[in-house]
Regions:
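Canonical positions in the second alpha-helix
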Residues: 77, 110-111, 145-147, 180-181, ...
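Structural marker of alpha-solenoid helical repeat scaffolds
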Residues: 80, 113-115, 148-150, 184, ...
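Position-specific recognition of the canonical hydrophobic site in helix A of tetratricopeptide repeat
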Residues: 62, 96, 130, 166, ...
Length: 488
């Protein structure tokens, strides 16, 4: 219509002109500053550069990995502005980054003359000492300067100091440093959060109780202080007092997740499983589900013999952490208590599949198989158990019992001998041997072994019943037991 076709193709220069960055004031400013800087460097006529300009240039050169110009800018800046604490600090930071620690400390000495209470200089000196593994000097400079400052800066210094003590594994000093903060700033969240952990590490429960009681007197609505008080009571196994402290914490902040968690544990320690479930369910209602919480609720139902409910929570826990073999073992245990051997076997098998080196799982699986009359398969499980943990007597006892059950008496005696080689002398093995010998018809030997075991430790007679619950009623053994009681 107009006789030509418009060309909308732009050149690269034109595209750049439409780029927002092209019109960015900062970009233009730094470009001009760099030009002036290079003119100055060449000795040419140049515009005046201010303190802020030099700080901007140093940052620019550092960001662009221009070590030569960053170093030159630092030198010129501190020559032109020798009393600028900002530029002296920036130069020291640059020198530290270049690992020129001695030069950096010299610059900080100059800064100390200009601005003796510059907190950033104190932190930087400490950092330099730490880089050189001069830990005592890092601690000393922070300790010497902490009381020079008001609460906020003082707190920053003491928090830094506590971290250094942590690195040095001087854990008692970590606790005392955090305590110093709370004596003048009882609501400091960082210190309150950290001191709870360090009170436990240093077994400072009683001191922590006194400290937090004082804090609560000053700030009664301090939820974190009530929580820490509860943790301290719990550390001393004063569970009722811990529960009361958590109640106050939750009255102030009903979204305090760890208070629910710890209170639930305190109720569990007191075997108040209903209350524990109630509290842990509250935790689930306000927080993202966690396998440890679901596992704990399952445990509480388990203890109340509500096995179906226990399994429900164990399974929910396993969905969040499918590689936790112990959860599947616990599921198997609930089925075992209900004598549901096949289901128990499946749960134990999953646990063993995840953790093939757990002797307890092999034993549990073997016990299920024995109950299901799968004797040979059970024997394999027991043999695996003793191979995994030959130092535990219970694995050998399970194997011996299985051999006894299927009337492999000689093999059972042989395994008892091997068990003693690995575990040493055990009274339980003597009781086991007595039962086996009696079943072989070796009455005199059996009686001698039983009498020996009773003399050695009569309280372990359950080992005899473990092998064969009815054997204590055998006339021969019954007579020995009656005679032994009369002697007593």
């Amino acid at each position: 219509m107009f006789g030509y076709s418009p060309n909308f193709t732009l050149t690269k220069i034109e595209i750049d002109m439409f780029n927002d960055d092209f019109f960015d004031d900062d970009f233009r400013d730094i470009e001009n500053l760099v030009i002036e800087f290079h003119r100055m460097k060449k000795g040419e006529s140049h515009g005046l550069l201010s303190e802020d300009d030099f700080e901007y240039l140093i940052d620019y050169f550092e960001a662009n990995y221009d070590k030569e110009n960053a170093t030159y800018a630092c030198e010129v800046a501190t020559t032109l502005f020798p009393f600028s604490s900002t530029l002296l600090l920036r130069k020291a930071e640059w020198l530290m980054d270049q690992k020129k620690y001695g030069q950096a400390l010299n610059v900080l000495d100059q800064l100390d003359e200009v601005d003796p209470n510059n907190i950033e200089s104190i932190f930087l000196q400490s950092d330099i000492f730490l880089e050189q593994n001069r830990f005592s000097e890092a601690v000393d400079i922070l300790e010497r300067n902490a009381d020079k400052f008001d609460s906020v800066d003082k707190t920053d210094i003491l928090l830094e100091l506590s971290e250094i003590y942590d690195e040095l594994e001087e854990f008692d000093k970590v606790y005392t440093t955090l305590k110093r903060i709370l004596t003048y700033e009882p609501t400091n969240e960082d210190a309150l959060l950290r001191i709870c952990f360090w009170a436990e590490i240093n077994n400072k429960h009683e001191d922590s109780i006194s400290l937090h009681q004082e804090i609560i007197e000053q700030t009664p609505f301090n939820a974190m202080a009530w929580y820490n008080l509860g943790v301290a009571y719990q550390g001393l196994k004063l569970y009722e007092k811990a529960i009361d402290a958590y109640d106050y914490c939750l009255a102030i902040d009903d979204k305090f997740e760890y208070a629910y968690r710890n209170q639930g544990d305190a109720y569990m320690q007191l075997k108040k499983y209903d209350k524990a479930i109630e509290v842990l369910e509250m935790h689930l209602s306000i927080a993202k589900p966690e396998d440890v919480i679901l596992d704990a609720i399952g445990y509480c139902w388990d203890k109340q013999k509500q096995y179906s409910k226990a399994r429900h929570y164990y399974r929910r826990a396993s969905q969040l952490n499918p590689q936790d073999d112990q959860i599947f073992y616990k599921i198997g245990e609930t089925y075992t208590k209900e004598l549901q051997w096949e289901k128990a076997m499946k749960a134990y098998s999953i646990a063993l599949h995840i953790n093939k080196n757990n002797a307890s799982y092999c034993l549990a699986l073997g016990n299920c198989l024995m109950e299901m009359h799968a004797d040979k398969e059970a024997m394999i499980c027991y043999l695996n158990a003793v191979q995994l943990r030959p130092d535990i007597k219970s694995t050998w006892q399970a194997l011996v019992k299985a051999l006894y059950t299927i009337s492999y008496f000689e093999e059972a005696l042989s395994q008892l001998g091997i068990a003693e080689e690995h575990c040493g002398h055990k009274t339980e093995f003597i009781y086991n041997k007595a039962a086996i010998l009696l079943s072989q018809g070796k009455t005199k030997e059996a009686v001698l072994q039983l009498e020996h075991a009773l003399t050695e430790n009569n309280k372990k007679i359950s080992a005899l019943k473990y092998i064969d619950n009815e054997i204590v009623h055998h006339p021969v053994f019954a007579e020995v037991l009656v005679r032994y009681k009369k002697k007593k």
